[in-house]
Curated annotation (Swiss-Prot):
This is Alpha-aminoadipate--LysW ligase LysX. A motif (N-[TS] motif that is essential for LysX substrate specificity) lies at residues 262-263. The gene is lysX. Its cofactor is Mg(2+). Mg(2+) 2 binds at residues 253, 255. Belongs to the RimK family. LysX subfamily. Catalyzes the ATP-dependent formation of a covalent bond between the amino group of alpha-aminoadipate (AAA) and the gamma-carboxyl group of the C-terminal glutamate residue in LysW. Keywords: Amino-acid biosynthesis, ATP-binding, Ligase, Lysine biosynthesis, Magnesium, Metal-binding, Nucleotide-binding. Binds 2 magnesium ions per subunit. Homodimer.
Length: 285
């Protein structure tokens, strides 16, 4: 099998993915995005050869979507495809799809003026969480304890360069324990995950200091993860889940280019090898 791995930053995951693929006897062609280009309707494009699959590993959402689109235009199988990446990156798109199919998500308000956002936030009761429509690693996600705090956050958002700065996404503050769950779907399975524990901060992103711990996946969580995968699409997803003491599992977000270094470390589970073997099965079908 010939694999292309496209990346803009060579992190542990990309290095491990290339290493494990080569260990399994596959040919890997690393593609550095900043050196990559494409001319539409032009014969001067450099050929990438007979790639069986391109694995998308760009950290930049824009680069990921556009390069996946190019590879799809060239008829390469791409993990993940551009449609999946768009659904994952846009939180309102994700929430809309999941709620439409009966998946429990945080109570969410979307408003198009600051005044309406402030008015509707009272229906959720404080504290509330404000987050950008697009973004990752917990950046620009804030908790407002009252209306005055929320107003300040909304005004700050308006003066940023965010693409959706005049769209206000406000959610309930889910009273989860000092942790959340990241569970991975690979192909048609949900084989591994972690708890992300942070007793010092309400944000549970490992990028913000949360500690990874092994996750024992129960049947309900596994079924839920696979339902989300079927709705969103994609071959390799990282799904973030809250545990509400009364309502049970709540899907928070879905990541289309998930990091997994900490998952490998605490579970002693080779995510890269598992992913490659599932790709092998997929290609043979």
């Amino acid at each position: 099998m010939i694999l292309g791995v496209i990346y803009d930053l060579l992190r542990w995951e990309e290095k491990n993915l290339i290493q494990e693929a080569r260990k399994l006897g596959h040919t890997v062609i690393p593609i550095y995005t900043k050196d990559f280009y494409y001319f539409y309707n032009n014969d001067s494009n450099e050929t990438l050869g007979d790639l069986d699959v391109v694995i998308q590993r760009n950290t930049s959402h824009a680069r990921a979507v556009i390069t996946s689109t190019i590879f799809e235009n060239l008829s390469y199988k791409t993990i993940n495809d551009s449609s999946t990446l768009i659904k994952c990156e846009n939180k309102l798109y994700t929430l809309s799809l999941l709620s439409k199919h009966g998946i429990r998500v945080p109570k969410t308000i979307v408003a198009f003026s600051k005044e309406k956002a402030l008015e509707l936030a009272n229906k959720l009761s404080y504290p509330v969480v404000i987050k950008p429509v697009e973004g990752s690693w917990g950046r620009m996600v804030a908790r407002a304890i009252d209306e005055d705090t929320l107003r300040n956050f909304l005004e700050y958002q308006e003066y940023t360069t965010l693409q959706f700065r005049y769209i206000y996404l406000i959610q309930e503050f889910v009273k989860k324990p000092d942790r959340d769950i990241r569970i991975f779907t690979i192909g048609d399975e949900a084989p591994v995950g972690i708890y992300r524990v942070n007793s010092r901060n309400w944000k549970t992103n490992t990028a913000l200091g949360a500690k990874a711990e092994p996750l024992k996946i129960d049947e309900e969580l596994q079924d839920l993860a696979l339902k989300v995968k079927d709705i969103i699409g994609g071959f390799f997803l990282g799904i973030d889940v809250f545990e509400d003491p009364e309502r049970g599992y709540i899907i928070n977000e879905v990541n289309g280019v998930p990091e997994y270094k900490n998952t490998v470390r605490v579970n002693n589970f080779n995510v890269s090898e598992y992913l490659i073997r599932k790709i092998e099965e997929w290609i043979k079908k």
